[in-house]
Amino acid sequence: MSFSRRRFLTLGLPALGISPTFAQSAGNAPQLRFGVIADPQYVDAPEKGTRHYRASLAKLEACIAELNQHDLAFTITLGDLIDRDFKSFDPVLERYAKLKSPHRIVPGNHDFAVADADKPRVMEKLGLQSGHQSLSHGNWRFIVIDGTEISPYRYPESDPRTAEATKLLESLKTQGHNNAQSWNGAVSDTQLQWLEKELTAAKQANQRAIICGHFPLLPENDSHRLWNAEAVVKVIGRHPHVAAYLNGHNHKGNYAQAGTCHYVNFKGMVETASDNPFAIVTCYEDHLTIEGFGPEPSRQKLS
């Protein structure tokens, strides 16, 4: 299994009301660390193009063995534990059970690529009562948004919500949106209001926030973006204490910055036969560092 540590990407974080800086504060002690995995997308099927589905089990084992050597507050998977088929979950979750740190999961589009009869069972299988969630770790609040909430794949075909999402998708296609793709999705107005409340509560508690989702929000030319990415970016833009938005979905990875928020798209584990991308994020008072493994980039030009 091939992975190696990559050099650090240092992301400067502004203090509330203070302009951002990429300068690392040498005196800062780490406040917490967490692991990041994106798109294992396992299924017992032959490789297709650059996607090596079966190899993801061995990659997960190697990744988890490495993560277990670090003192992590938690590890988060940014969606798509499986590629398809409900039976694919068990082998994947057996590997995750070896994690020493708590495991947080973001639901992804492929996690619902199961038979209609199994779709209502997916969230329970992932141990999720809700796709969107919030948890605090000291001075940090981690918020997960659920971009599968409005989508043509989340619910059985007979569910009215599937027809509503399909209608929205066709409207977006008619309007020429590059992210009007059936494998994307959207968050509801109710979830947007919840996000606003969570970010306001974080500010009142003097916490910085990191938001995690499956779908990218930026850059605008990425066809993998959430259908209503602009609405989420607008909410984030009102809250300068949001340090970063972390996501998967686009297996190539990506990076953007808007205002004081860093938008980091982590590479998909399912890509390539042996290269194994994952990362460890370390949170300091005024910056983040991302330690990439395997092909996960260092993005050193931002330092």
Language-model-derived ranges and their functions:
Residues 40-43, 81-84, 109-113, 148-151, ...:
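Solvent-exposed loop/turn segments at secondary-structure junctions
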Residues 51-55, 186-187, 224-227:
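Alpha-helix N-cap and loop-to-helix initiation/capping positions
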Residues 1-25:
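N-terminal export signals
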Residues 24-90, 190:
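N-terminal active-site segment of His-dependent metallophosphoesterases
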Residues 37-38, 75-79, 104-109, 210-213, ...:
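Active-site neighborhood of phospho(di)ester-bond hydrolases with catalytic His/Asp-centered motifs
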Residues 32, 73, 132, 140, ...:
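Alpha/beta-hydrolase fold active-site loops
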Residues 87-205, 231-241, 256-292, 302:
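Extended active-site neighborhood of metal-dependent phosphoesterases/phosphodiesterases
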Residues 202-220:
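Short acidic, glycine-rich surface-loop motifs adjacent to enzyme active sites
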